């Protein structure tokens, strides 16, 4: 059974999100991507200090199959400007059968 996952990737800007998204689609590691901007990320920086930093980023949401995860993760890390990019996969527990069929066809 094919398991769909949604992969969230924070990018430095829209150009980076578009570049990574296009590569993922061309390599058949993503059937579809969505790009949302701006998203505001908040975190402690430098790490383990008490200064809260807020930055605008671009969110790349990737629709793919769980079987593509390792290749996708490697490709994103190679093409991302961050030392530690956010690459988080969430399983889609309920997906319409037609959409899952389309997604699977696009990725095989």
Across the structure, where does each feature detected by a protein language model lie?
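Positively charged, small/polar-rich N-terminal and surface patches that mediate targeting and assembly
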Residues: 1-108
